[in-house]
Curated annotation (Swiss-Prot):
Source species: Pasteurella multocida (strain Pm70)
InterPro entries per the UniProt record, alphabetical: ATPase_NBD, Heat_shock_70_CS, HscA_NBD, HSP70_C_sf, HSP70_peptide-bd_sf, Hsp_70_fam, ISC_FeS_clus_asmbl_HscA
PROSITE patterns, A to Z: HSP70_1, HSP70_2, HSP70_3
One Pfam family this sequence matches: HSP70
Family: Belongs to the heat shock protein 70 family.
Annotated function: Chaperone involved in the maturation of iron-sulfur cluster-containing proteins. Has a low intrinsic ATPase activity which is markedly stimulated by HscB.
MF (Gene Ontology): ATP binding; ATP hydrolysis activity; ATP-dependent protein folding chaperone; unfolded protein binding
Any one Gene Ontology BP term: iron-sulfur cluster assembly
Transmembrane segments: none
Keyword Aminoacyl-tRNA synthetase: no
Key words of the record: ATP-binding, Chaperone, Nucleotide-binding
UniProt entry tagged with the keyword Oxidoreductase: no
Protein name from the UniProt record: Chaperone protein HscA homolog
Length: 620
C-alpha cells in the first residue's frame, strides 16, 4: 500500500497529491506512453494528436530526429536511420549479424562484443539509440502533463533475458527516467483487460508485435494475476510478414534492390501492402516500373508458416500450464500484427473462441503499464491486485561430478528467493567455485552456463565441516542475483547474472524437449556420476586415514585395504553404478577394523592425563 506522508506542524502533508507517472510500451515498430488522469488511463497524444511514435531514430551531425519525421528519412539515408532497434538491444554483434544479415547499418564491435552502429553523429550503441526514443516520449509526457515525471513503468517482451532487460534499464537511465519497474508486455495487457472487464479464469495473451511474439497463459482469480506459463519467439513479428512480402515481390518482378535505399523502399512498400490487405481482399503493387496485384489469400499463404510457428508456441505454453485450449476463457490479442485477419482467424480456430479485441491491440500494453505505474508511484492502493510472473527455465548450480542441483524450478513465480547449503569436498578447502546454470537436464554439460564466480576465505576445516549457503534471488524484473556465504565467518561473494545474449523460444523448446527425450538416460548418468563422486570421497577419506595411522595395520591388513583401494579406483573409471557401489562396500568392509582402531586411538588420546571423575562430570 502507499505510504502516507507526515508533515511538520503548520505545513500541509498533501497526502493525496497526485504524482505524475507513465507507462511506456517501448515497441519494436511503434512506442506509446500512457498515464492515469481523473481515474482513467489513456494514451498521451503528440502535437498532431497521434497516439503512436514510430520507433525510428535518424542521426545527423548536429541533430537527432525521432518518430514520424525520422521514418520519412529512412529511404534517403538508411545507414543513419535506425529502425527496430529493440531487436538489437542486449545482443552480441555476432548474434545480430547471424539473425539479421541484411540490415543496412555499418556495424562494429564494442570491447565486450556488443554491436555499435556508425552514423553521422558518431558510433552509437542500441542502448543510446533506445534512449533517444525514451527521451522523446518523456518530453511529450511532461509537456502534456505540465509537470515532471516521478517515474515510469517500461514494458519488455516476456522472453527478454537479463542482458536485454538490463540494457533497457540502462537506456532509461540515459534518458533521465526513474524506472519504477520493468513489466512483461503480456502481463501489462492482462492488467488492462483484467481491470476493465473483471474476468476470472484462464486467459491466453497472444502478443504479436513488429519484432517479437509472446504467448502467456494466465489465471485470473479474485484480483490475482498469475502467469501459469510463458512462451514465444524473440525473432518473430510483423517485420517477418514484411520480409515474406518483399521476397515475393522480388520473385514476381525479377527486380532485386541494388542498394540500401532501394532495400528500404521495398520494406516500406511491403508494409503498405500488408496494411492494405487488412481491409481489402486485393491490392495493386507498383515497384520500380513493375505493376502487379496480390490477394489476401496469397498473402495468407506467404505468412502461413510464421503464424503456425506462433501457434506451436501456444500449444507448448498450454502444455506447460497443464491446461487445455478449451479451458481458456478468453484470448487477448496484443500487438499491431494481430490486426491481420489471417492471424485472428487462426488464433480463433486454435482456441475455439473469438479473441478479445475491445481494446486497441496497439495500445493495450501501454494502458496496462500506465495503470501499474499509477499504483507503484503511490496514487492508487494496490491491495486489490497482485502480479505473479514466472521464469521459463530452471536455475541451478554445478555440484561435484558435473551434476546440476536445481535451486529454482522452471515456472516458479517471481520475485523469488531460494537458498541451499553446500559443504566443502576436501580437507583444508579454502575456496569454492560457484557455477550458475540454466536448464532442465541432470548434467552441467547439457545445460546453459550463465555465470561463474568464486567464494574465497573459507576456513580450513575437515571435508564437509564448512557450510556455504548459496542464495538465488530473481527480482520482479527477472534479473538474477546469486550470493554465496560461508556461515561461520560470514564471508561472502555475489554476482548479478547478465548473459551477453538471450535464448530464442526455439532454443528453450529444444532444451525442454531434450530433457524429456533423455530423461531416463539423464537419471542413469546422474546416478553414475553420484556414485563416482561418492567413490572419490571415500578414496580420499581412506587415503587421509592411511597417511595418519597406517601403523595401526599389520602387513596383511594393509595389503587388503590397498587392494580394495586399487579395485575401487579402477571401478570408479570403468565400472557402472552398481559395480562402483559394490566397490565402495568392499572398501568399507576392508577398513572396518582400521576405523575401529582409529576410534580407540582417538579416545585414548582424548582421555590421556584426565581423571575418571573429570570425564564423568564433563559427560553430565
Amino acid at each position: 500500500m502507499a505510504l502516507l506522508q507526515i508533515a511538520e506542524p503548520g505545513q500541509s502533508a498533501s497526502p493525496h497529491q497526485h504524482k505524475l507517472a507513465v507507462g511506456i510500451d517501448l515497441g519494436t515498430t511503434n512506442s506509446l506512453i500512457a498515464t492515469v488522469r481523473s481515474g482513467q488511463v489513456d494514451i498521451l497524444l503528440d502535437e498532431k494528436e497521434r497516439p503512436l511514435l514510430p520507433s525510428v531514430v535518424h542521426f545527423e551531425q548536429d541533430n537527432v530526429i525521432v518518430g514520424y519525421e525520422a521514418a520519412e528519412l529512412a529511404s534517403q539515408s538508411p545507414q543513419n536511420t535506425i529502425v527496430s532497434v529493440k531487436r538489437l538491444i542486449g545482443r552480441s554483434l555476432a548474434d545480430v549479424q547471424q539473425r539479421y544479415p541484411s540490415l543496412p547499418y555499418q556495424f562494429e564491435a564494442s570491447e565486450n562484443g556488443l554491436p555499435l552502429i556508425r552514423t553521422s553523429k558518431g558510433t552509437l550503441s542500441p542502448v543510446e539509440i533506445s534512449a533517444e526514443i525514451l527521451k522523446k516520449l518523456t518530453a511529450l509526457a511532461e509537456k502534456r502533463l505540465a509537470g515532471e515525471l516521478s517515474g515510469a513503468v517500461i514494458t519488455v517482451p516476456a522472453y527478454f533475458d537479463d542482458a536485454q532487460r538490463q540494457s533497457t534499464k540502462d537506456a532509461a537511465k540515459l534518458a533521465g527516467i526513474n524506472v519504477l519497474r520493468l513489466l512483461n508486455e503480456p502481463t501489462a495487457a492482462a492488467i488492462a483487460y483484467g481491470l476493465d472487464s473483471g474476468q476470472e479464469g484462464v486467459i491466453a495473451v497472444y502478443d504479436l508485435g513488429g519484432g517479437t511474439f509472446d504467448i502467456s497463459i494466465l489465471r485470473l482469480s479474485k484480483g490475482v494475476f498469475e502467469v501459469l506459463a510463458t512462451g514465444g519467439d524473440t525473432a518473430l513479428g510483423g517485420d517477418d510478414f514484411d520480409h515474406q512480402l518483399m521476397d515475393w515481390i522480388v520473385a514476381q518482378s525479377g527486380i532485386a534492390p541494388q542498394n540500401a535505399q532501394q532495400q528500404r523502399q521495398l520494406t516500406e512498400l511491403a508494409t503498405q501492402i500488408k496494411i492494405a490487405l487488412t481491409d481489402k481482399l486485393e491490392t495493386s503493387i507498383s515497384y520500380q516500373g513493375w505493376q502487379g496485384n496480390i490477394s489476401r489469400e496469397q498473402f495468407n499463404q506467404l505468412i502461413q508458416g510464421l503464424v503456425k510457428r506462433s501457434l506451436l508456441a501456444c500449444r507448448r505454453a498450454l502444455k506447460d500450464a497443464d491446461v487445455s485450449a478449451d479451458e481458456v476463457c478468453e484470448v487477448v490479442m496484443v500487438g499491431g500484427s494481430t490486426r491481420v485477419p489471417f492471424v485472428r482467424e487462426q488464433v480463433a480456430a486454435f482456441f475455439q473462441k473469438e479473441p478479445l479485441t475491445s481494446i486497441d491491440p496497439d495500445k493495450v500494453v501501454a494502458l496496462g503499464a500506465g495503470i501499474q505505474a499509477d499504483i507503484l508511484v503511490g496514487n492508487k492502493p494496490d491491495a486489490d491486485m497482485l502480479l505473479l510472473d514466472v521464469i521459463p527455465l530452471s536455475l541451478g548450480i554445478e555440484t561435484m561430478g558435473g551434476l546440476v542441483e536445481k535451486i529454482i524450478p522452471r515456472n516458479t513465480t517471481i520475485p523469488v528467493a531460494r537458498a541451499q547449503e553446500f559443504t566443502t569436498f576436501k580437507d583444508g578447502q579454502t575456496a569454492m567455485s560457484v557455477h550458475v546454470v540454466q536448464g532442465e537436464r541432470e548434467m552441467v554439460a547439457d545445460c546453459r552456463s550463465l555465470a561463474r564466480f568464486s567464494l574465497r576465505g573459507i576456513p580450513a576445516m575437515a571435508a564437509g565441516a564448512a557450510h556455504v549457503r548459496v542464495t538465488y534471488q530473481v527480482d520482479a524484473d527477472g534479473l538474477l542475483s546469486v550470493t554465496a556465504m560461508e556461515k561461520s565467518t560470514g564471508v561472502q561473494s555475489s554476482i548479478q547474472v547478465k548473459p551477453s545474449y538471450g535464448l530464442s523460444d526455439d532454443e528453450i523448446t529444444n532444451m525442454l524437449k531434450a530433457s524429456m527425450l533423455n530423461a531416463k538416460e539423464d537419471i542413469q548418468a546422474r546416478l553414475l556420476a553420484e556414485q563416482r563422486v561418492e567413490a572419490q570421497r571415500v578414496l580420499e577419506s581412506v587415503g587421509s586415514a592411511l597417511s595418519a595411522d597406517q601403523d595401526l595395520l599389520n602387513d596383511e591388513e594393509l595389503s587388503a585395504v590397498k587392494n580394495a583401494i586399487i579395485s575401487l579406483q579402477r571401478l570408479q573409471k570403468e565400472g557402472d553404478t552398481q559395480e562402483i557401489k559394490q566397490g565402495i562396500k568392499q572398501l568399507d568392509l576392508a577398513t572396518q577394523e582400521f576405523a575401529s582402531r582409529r576410534m580407540d586411538k582417538s579416545i585414548r588420546q582424548a582421555l590421556a592425563g584426565k581423571a575418571i571423575d573429570d570425564v564423568m562430570k564433563n559427560a553430565k
